[in-house]
């Protein structure tokens, strides 16, 4: 099953390349119980034994993989994804942090940003 999934993904990537009308950066976001690119060295969330991010880069795409909490809420994952893309101090917001008794701005969670110019004029593709 894993080989079929990877093969289908790669086939769709190759065949749709000629149909693509843009080269917006691709942001890969793992799901529930997932992991980031550097968190498990032997297996990639996006590709298993293969490396989908590296493959897409090899054919000319700009690709980034964000790492969010594996059991975090949708809200927390969205905030973490936003700051990893845009950059800045991770900030869950005062109301959310107070409501769930969590740190609003976790120490050491400052991101350079994969694509700080993300905006209406500079869109991205989010794949999750």
Spans of model-derived segments:
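Sec-dependent signal peptide recognition
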Residues: 2-8
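N-terminal non-catalytic accessory region
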Residues: 19-127
